Design a protein with these regions (language model features):
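Ligand-binding clefts/hinges and TM-proximal coupling segments of bilobed small-molecule sensing domains
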Residues: 162-175, 249-301, 305-308
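Extracytoplasmic small-molecule ligand-binding "clamshell" domains
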Residues: 36-110, 264, 269, 273, ...
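Extended ligand-binding regions for polar small-molecule ligands
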Residues: 71-79, 138-141, 145-146, 150-151, ...
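Immediate post-signal peptide segment of exported/extracytoplasmic ligand-binding proteins
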Residues: 35-64, 140-141, 145-151, 294-308
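Paired acidic/hydrophobic, glycine-rich loop segments that form the ligand-binding mouth/hinge
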Residues: 50, 104-109, 191-196, 203, ...
Length: 308
């Protein structure tokens, strides 16, 4: 989730029922072997997790976390010997819980940003969110030039609303929720819809009758972004799990688990499970290392990757 996640998460309510909002739920992992003092936890042996329901990234079902981010964190917690206490809230509540030390960690497609890292800690990226489009039929839109003159849509408040408005001769449209985007693509009124990538694949699974499919956009060049500044939102971005500033040891421990999952293939398996392409989600773009080097990572840091 990039800028305007508050809106994006609120709009997601049209697809995901927030029936467990505000409840404290518990999911048991393996017996705790981690030293609470070493990991700076709020409660000994327990990882307090703040989430907002947003499938297929995060949700709570039968008292357990489900979704891509949930599976990644559950695997990390298991390896660290921690159980999890789950607090369900909304997106601003997630961030506030971490920033005020009412949660040990929050997850759910959270985009790394310089502003956020100043008031919290980010793990290494569990995955990268590629620029994805919802399309129908056999038409192909490989790059931004192919979008010119087309009917383009997204949800009101999403950053892609700025991007599609800058595409030459295109007709930009915004909708109150993702369902409206899907409906107009299915009916042929829209050529392309810009949404979170796994939301598109999840829609494919849940509503195959709509015949909506995902297509990945080749990111714009630096020259194209210079000419159309809001094209920057057509680029991939880093996600991360978000922790309090006071928890560097926990952030390092979770990052180590994430890095190990890149190496052992388990992250690729989870991305595939939830409808993503590992080559799109687990390979950073060239500019990403520089964004964090000397900011919240050492000067020689390299983002984790499945690329050899």
């Amino acid at each position: 989730m990039k800028h305007a996640e508050l809106t994006k998460k609120s709009q997601a309510n049209g697809i995901i029922a927030l029936s467990v909002l505000g409840l404290g739920l518990f999911a048991t992992a393996v017996p705790s072997t981690a030293n609470a003092d070493d990991l700076e936890l709020m409660k000994p042996g327990t990882l307090v997790v703040a989430v907002q329901p947003y499938m297929p990234y995060t949700a709570v079902k039968d008292g357990k976390l489900v979704g891509l981010d949930s599976d990644i964190l559950t695997a990390a917690a298991d390896k660290l010997g921690l159980k999890m206490e789950i607090n369900v809230t909304d997106f601003p509540g997630m961030l506030a819980s971490v920033q005020t030390q009412r949660a040990d960690i929050t997850i759910g497609g959270i985009a790394w940003s310089d502003a956020r890292q100043k008031v919290g800690l980010f793990t290494d990226p569990p995955y990268y969110s590629p620029p994805a489009m919802a399309v129908s039929g056999t038409a192909s839109f490989p790059d931004v030039a192919s979008l010119e003159g087309k009917n383009l849509g997204t949800v009101t408040g999403y950053v892609w609303a700025k991007s599609i408005a800058q595409v030459p001769n295109a007709s930009p449209h915004t909708f109150p929720n993702a369902e409206g985007v899907f409906q107009d693509i299915s009916s042929g009124r829209l050529d392309v819809g810009f949404l979170d990538p796994l939301l598109i694949t999840y829609q494919q699974q849940q509503r195959p009758d709509m015949k909506v499919r995902i297509e990945y956009l080749k990111p714009p060049t630096n020259e194209q972004v210079a000419a159309h500044p809001d094209y920057k939102y057509f680029q991939a971005y880093m996600t991360g799990f978000y922790l309090p500033k006071q928890s560097p040891k926990l952030a390092k421990a979770v990052s180590d688990q994430i890095d190990g999952m890149y190496k052992d293939g388990s992250l690729a398996a989870l991305i595939t499970k939830w409808g993503g392409d590992p080559k799109q989600f687990l390979v950073p773009s060239p500019e990403m290392a520089a964004q964090r080097r000397g900011v919240d990572r050492p000067a020689d840091w390299n983002p984790p990757s499945i690329a050899k």
